[in-house]
């Protein structure tokens, strides 16, 4: 799964400040939280499993996209799945969804694939135009620090409706989660 959905630890190499902020955030613990795990298991029990991957889709989008069973132990999950809402969960989405289901259309791919964000490509171009200075590479197997081939503009990433895909959840019985 690292080649499909790179780990946040991989992103840390170039983005230590952002990684450190994420590492102490609720996003990094979303799949590991004992409160979440208890509630998710209870909901699955009360719904006789018909709730499916509803909780997993937001708490571990990578796990949901990998098809992991919602009842699977975290010990058996892929390490990137255990990271919860990791860097690629937000930066590998390139279209508006505007639905509150957590069904995120994550683009799969290695670290070399493009990422998306509100700032676009200016900084990435500066680094790519100075590959030797920054010792970065954009080809599999090249010696050096791998970097995305581009960063594409996606202003929706900084909108509340983007976050609302998960942060505006309601259970099947109408109970509002947030």
Please tell me what each predicted stretch does.
Residues 1-83, 95-158, 164-178:
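Sequence context of c-type cytochrome heme-c attachment sites
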Residues 83-89:
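Elongated alpha-helical scaffolds
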């Amino acid at each position: 799964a690292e080649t499909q959905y790179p780990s946040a630890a991989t992103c840390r190499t170039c983005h230590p400040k952002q990684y450190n902020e994420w590492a102490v955030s609720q996003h990094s613990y979303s799949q590991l939280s004992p409160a979440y795990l208890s509630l998710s298991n209870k909901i699955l029990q009360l719904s006789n499993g018909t709730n499916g991957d509803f909780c997993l889709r937001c708490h571990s989008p990578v796990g949901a996209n990998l098809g992991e069973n919602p009842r699977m132990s975290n010990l058996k999950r892929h390490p990137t799945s255990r990271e919860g809402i990791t860097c690629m969960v937000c930066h590998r989405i390139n279209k508006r969804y505007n639905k509150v289901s957590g069904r995120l259309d994550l683009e799969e791919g290695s670290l070399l694939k493009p990422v998306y964000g509100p700032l676009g490509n200016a900084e990435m171009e500066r680094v790519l135009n100075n590959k030797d200075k920054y010792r970065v590479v954009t080809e599999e197997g090249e010696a050096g620090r791998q970097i995305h081939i581009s960063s594409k503009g996606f202003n929706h990433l900084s909108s509340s409706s983007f976050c609302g895909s998960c942060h505006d959840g309601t259970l099947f019985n109408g109970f509002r989660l947030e």
